Regions:
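Short beta-strand segments that buttress and anchor functional surface loops
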Residues: 71-77, 97-104
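Hydrophobic ligand-binding cavity/cleft-lining segments
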Residues: 2-69, 77, 161, 165-172
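Short strand-connecting beta-turns/loops that link adjacent beta-strands
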Residues: 39, 93, 118-122
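Short, cysteine-centered beta-strand-loop-beta hairpins and adjacent loop/turn segments enriched
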Residues: 76-82, 134-139
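Beta-strand/loop substructures that line and gate deep hydrophobic ligand-binding cavities in soluble
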Residues: 100-157, 164
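Intrinsic-disorder/low-complexity, polar/charged segments enriched in Ser/Thr/Lys/Arg/Asp/Glu/Gln
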Residues: 27-33, 69, 83, 96, ...
Length: 173
């Protein structure tokens, strides 16, 4: 937990080792970002509505929030959904959303999404920092394989999808 707390508190805009380091003890860490040509509050509100997550993160199934606890599922081995249950630990409108998994979650995870005005009035910088500890056994092996090659986190495909979705919606008459 010490590494996770330090990770959560750290400003990982420029992670150690120039961003090459992807492990902190048992924790695996991904940092991705994108610029969305929409106002910061609009991008924040869209992300904050957890039912929107499956629209741009294709490995996330239906998600809902009750009293600051988000329950959802991610694709698991053999089409089996894996429960992710996380408590919101920070919700600063227009700035940051942060979470940490509960003991009931099948995957130990924590992370944050930051929203900043992009330079030159170009919209919003979105930065997602996700840390997780793969569980032991078959599920853990599957998660390690998936996240090692998963373009949703590694290549920022989910954020690119968010960008396209929000910018297209804004362009519609």
């Amino acid at each position: 937990w010490r590494a996770a707390r330090a990770l959560h508190a750290a400003d990982l805009r420029h992670p150690p080792d120039g961003g090459r380091r992807r492990r902190y003890g048992d924790w695996r860490v991904e940092v991705v970002g994108a610029v969305v040509d929409r106002p910061r509050d609009e991008v924040y509100r869209f992300w904050r509505e957890v039912s929107n997550l499956p629209l741009f993160l294709d490995h996330v199934g239906a998600a809902h929030e009750i009293d600051g606890v988000v329950r959802g599922a991610v694709d698991g081995p053999g089409e089996r959904p894996v429960a992710v249950i996380a408590r919101l630990v920070s919700d600063r409108p227009g700035e940051e959303i942060a979470w940490a998994s509960t003991e009931a979650s099948e995957v130990e995870t924590r992370g944050k999404v930051r929203f900043r005005d992009a330079p030159g009035g170009r919209g919003t910088e979105v930065e997602a920092i996700v840390a997780y500890i793969p569980p032991p056994g078959r599920l853990g092996a599957w998660i390690r394989r998936r996240f090692r090659r998963d373009p949703d986190l590694r290549g920022g495909r989910g954020l690119r999808r968010l960008k396209r979705l929000m910018e297209r919606e804004a362009a519609r008459p």
